[in-house]
């Protein structure tokens, strides 16, 4: 398993090692060991808006996940906007760092097959798993 973190923004310090550690823990738990790669692009609102155009949207989002299949050499790409995360973190009572990792986990779950747009049941399951990882890997560890 290889996790590539590409930081294309200068708005916030990014801890690439911690991003890789969290990604590896989630992926190991969800899919086990494998000979695959995952790319995580850290960017700003302007850049993520360009990616969103492929989805027919002209506004930024906090995260986009492009899943290519778990049997592929590159299982997916995750794009995260630090600007969007910075704006929304206070709304959820999170620090920037907490919100960043919460959104990272969200993107990872999409890569391994979770979806919250198909049904309320799927959404409930995905957000429960996301919250579990967040409290296991981020929130509870800070105390």
From Swiss-Prot:
Q: Name one GO molecular function term.
A: RNA endonuclease activity
Co-factor note (free text): Binds 1 zinc ion.
One Pfam assignment: YbeY
One GO CC annotation, please?
A: cytoplasm
Q: Which UniProt keywords apply?
A: Cytoplasm, Endonuclease, Hydrolase, Metal-binding, Nuclease, Ribosome biogenesis, rRNA processing, Zinc
Top EC category: hydrolase
Q: Which GO terms describe its biological process?
A: rRNA processing
Cellular compartments annotated: Cytoplasm
Per the UniProt record, which EC number(s) apply here?
3.1.-.-
**Where along the chain is Zn(2+) bound?**
106, 110, 116
List, separated by semicolons, the cofactors it needs. Zn(2+)
Q: What does this protein do?
A: Single strand-specific metallo-endoribonuclease involved in late-stage 70S ribosome quality control and in maturation of the 3' terminus of the 16S rRNA.
HAMAP family assigned to the protein according to its UniProt record, in alphabetical order: Endoribonucl_YbeY
Q: Which family does it belong to?
A: Belongs to the endoribonuclease YbeY family.
Q: Under which name does UniProt file this protein? A: Endoribonuclease YbeY
Q: What is the lineage of its organism?
A: Bacteria, Thermotogati, Thermotogota, Thermotogae, Petrotogales
